[in-house]
A protein has these predicted regions:
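N-terminal pre-Walker A segment at the start of P-loop NTPase domains
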Residues: 21-51
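A conserved segment at the C-terminal end of the G1
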Residues: 72-83
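Switch II (G3) loop of P-loop NTPases
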Residues: 141-164
Length: 316
């Protein structure tokens, strides 16, 4: 009788509509008997491979220097589903809700500060994968998105070292696309911009020499913090750097699909300029197979609706 009760409760708890999916993996200290609720934290390498064995995943490997906005981007991508409505991409669950909420809490508690800074992802942290289960209306399909949070220190250590890249970023073999962040504020100073372009080129060259590389790999170069440079990009030098960024990567086009985006994660729902891409547009580009990837990603700020008071501090 007791076992029957446990089974019935288990079925209710892990219904897909609850937004919590059953996990068959356990971490040290978890009880393996009776009802086991998933921790909901970020996944480690072992848990990622266990998840990929059960489900088809769309892994997006996010790399970039420390402070370039990678972790903020991931937190705000999750928060987008809490504050905006969209009829095409619907949030339908996550194995790592607690992990996302942990990231988002740093932004919430920093809401009164001039600058919002998330703690750096420690290099030795093994839990670095975040899961989003989405439903795509246009294709009537589900998509399990995995976002990897590769520490900035790992980026620096691996950008010119193939062996370290293969040993420390083992998820490249699973990645559907690689996203390389450039701190948008670097565009304001010539030396910093040249260094950022050089680092990005160097990483792409190392990826191409990696054992995990596949011809035709999707690489998206994302310039972050567009809201901090949008008022300055009327400066001819800054404008020229942004307009000519593609010229710096032409030699890699033959075996990589490289695209370029500018985003402002914290002020995403404010339409700041024609050159920026909303988080929703970027996510749609990544997951909606019905869209033609060769088409230019268009802004759709007019279609976004803020449906709650969540994080209204971002309007300041």
């Amino acid at each position: 009788m007791e076992n029957e009760i446990k089974e019935d409760i288990g079925k209710d708890i892990f219904e897909e509509d609850a937004g919590i999916e059953e996990q068959n993996y356990y971490r040290e200290g978890q009880v393996k008997e009776g009802i086991v609720l998933p921790l909901g934290l970020a996944l480690n390498d072992t848990e990622l491979y266990q998840l990929s064995a059960k489900k088809k995943i769309n892994l997006i490997c996010i790399m970039g220097p420390a402070g370039s906005g990678k972790t903020t981007f991931m937190a705000m991508l999750y928060s987008m589903f809490l504050r905006q409505s969209n009829n095409n991409i619907l949030f339908s669950g996550s194995d790592t809700i607690a992990g996302f909420e942990e990231l988002l809490n740093y932004i919430r508690v920093s809401s009164g500060k001039t600058n919002v800074e998330l703690p750096r992802t420690p290099k030795d942290r093994k839990e670095r994968y975040y899961h989003l289960k989405l439903y795509i209306n246009s294709t009537k399909k589900k998509s399990n998105i995995i976002l990897s949070d590769i520490p900035g220190e790992t980026f620096n250590a691996c950008k010119a070292n193939k062996d370290r890249l293969d040993s420390e970023v083992r998820c490249l073999a699973l990645a559907k696309r690689i996203v390389i962040f450039i701190d948008g504020k670097a565009v304001l100073k010539n030396a910093e911009w040249n260094a950022a372009i050089m680092d990005t080129r160097q990483l792409i060259m190392t990826i191409r020499s990696s054992e995990q590389f596949r011809a035709g790999t999707n690489i998206d170069v994302v310039i972050s913090k567009n809201d901090e440079i949008v008022g300055i990009n009327s400066n001819e030098k800054v404008k020229r750097r942004l307009m000519q960024i593609e010229n710096n990567f032409q030699q890699y086009y033959k075996d990589c699909k490289i695209r370029f985006f500018r985003i402002q994660a914290l002020n995403d729902y404010q339409h700041l300029d024609e050159g920026s891409t909303s988080l929703l547009d970027l996510l749609t580009f990544w997951v909606d197979e019905s869209s033609n990837e060769q088409k230019e990603v268009k802004n759709q700020y007019g279609e976004l609706q803020v449906i709650s008071q969540f994080n209204r501090f971002m309007e300041r």
